[in-house]
Amino acid sequence: MTTRQPLYKSLYVQVLVAITIGILLGHYYPETGVALKPLGDGFVKLIKMVIAPIIFCTVVSGIAGMQSMKSVGKTGGYALLYFEIVSTIALIIGLVVVNVVKPGAGMHIDVSTLNASSVAAYAAAGAQQTTVGFLLNVIPNTVVGAFANGDILQVLMFSVLFGFALHRLGSYGKPVLDMIDRFAHVMFNIINMIMKLAPIGAFGAMAFTIGQYGVGSLVQLGYLMACFYITCLLFVLVVLGGICRAHGFSVIKLIRYIREELLIVLGTSSSESALPRMLAKMERLGAKKSVVGLVIPTGYSFNLDGTSIYLTMAAVFIAQATDTTMDITHQITLLLVLLVASKGAAGVTGSGFIVLAATLSAVGHLPVAGLALILGIDRFMSEARALTNLVGNAVATVVVAKWVKEMDNDKLASELDSGGAPLIDTRPTDDLGVAEGPAR
């Protein structure tokens, strides 16, 4: 019989309390809040430090351990099909909502009065985003460079090739596979140690956000923010909820299952900060390692539902606020551009803004200087983006695993009904076994 851990030891409660304290500190002592930014940055950097090796271990172990290579291609194909369909729905929903609600109408902003210098860095980065450049960037110049830069897609590509090669070696490659499995357990132990700092990271990041931008500064653009948050909520409950119901599970129970990861993302505004834990959690939920290893990392570039909603809403909002004409032809062009450009966003803070800059440049008639309008609130909107992205990737993993019949449905039902035990165990490290890493 296991005893329930005290409430104060729950990561969920710790992060929630830390976020609350961070908001209060940032509001009443803004200068102190701004000075705490390194706490949030440091936590995210610690997470990023182990993402590449964890993806490598998970993908290689999953692919090398499969019976047939055909199933890898099948999983990847189904995943990309799902990503394209759902992200397109997200783009269309964002476009419909912003046209119906018209949050930017009546602002009559003169583009010449905007401070374009504040968005110059984003516009420059966005100008470099091309389809060919994105595809070529998936191929790393060197293996070491891919791991050093922490580029998820580059690491994923090398990991898939490594897994295929190891699979072809058969029993000869077994010692290497065993070593990678052991290395994975070490990496997940490191993640467990880092996660003990999650409340500190969330506290620092939230204190900085409120201290830097202030709650009062949100009033003018609060309408757009409210529309965006409500749209994301409806997307999760209606669209993703409908997908979940069609596949025999509840999105509400899934959200409860990943509640700790959602709070970490809420504090850091980066869905990437929860990636290592998501790999372990989705495998423990019943999805095979090979599916989790392909769907989750790939989804961080190809299945960003929250970012897709944000991109269409923000682009049309800028057009409305600056009285720029957006007829049906312009909006279809915008949608087509975003179908490609949105795949270049990563699950890190600020990437959505860079893709938005690229989109405004590509569409042509939309003023890039209009980005200055939403620069101040982008940081606040990033929370909803990141949370929606995380839930979207969790749903995608379960759905794709069910499609390729690599999901333990009994385990899925059991874990969701129980709400999922905390991933971080409070027992001494010596007593922890395989449970700390991905489920075997």
Swiss-Prot record:
Keyword line: Cell inner membrane, Cell membrane, Membrane, Symport, Transmembrane, Transmembrane helix, Transport
InterPro entries attached to this UniProt entry: C4_dicarb_transport (IPR023954), Na-dicarboxylate_symporter (IPR001991), Na-dicarboxylate_symporter_CS (IPR018107), Na:dicarbo_symporter_sf (IPR036458)
Where does the UniProt annotation locate this protein? Cell inner membrane
Q: Name one GO biological process term.
A: L-aspartate transmembrane transport
Residue stretches spanning the membrane = 7-29, 49-66, 79-101, 143-165, 186-208, 221-243, 291-313, 328-350, 355-377
User: Key word Cell division present in the record?
Assistant: no
Alphabetically, the GO molecular function entries are: fumarate transmembrane transporter activity; malate:proton symporter activity; succinate transmembrane transporter activity
**Spans annotated as Disordered:** 419-440
The record gives the membrane topology as: Multi-pass membrane protein
What coarse category fits the chief subcellular location reported for this protein? membrane
Its GO CC terms are: plasma membrane
Q: What does this protein do?
A: Responsible for the transport of dicarboxylates such as succinate, fumarate, and malate from the periplasm across the membrane.
Q: Which family does it belong to?
A: Belongs to the dicarboxylate/amino acid:cation symporter (DAACS) (TC 2.A.23) family.
PANTHER family tied to this protein = AEROBIC C4-DICARBOXYLATE TRANSPORT PROTEIN (PTHR42865:SF1), PROTON/GLUTAMATE-ASPARTATE SYMPORTER (PTHR42865)
| UniProt protein name | C4-dicarboxylate transport protein
Organism of derivation:
Pseudomonas putida (strain ATCC 47054 / DSM 6125 / CFBP 8728 / NCIMB 11950 / KT2440)
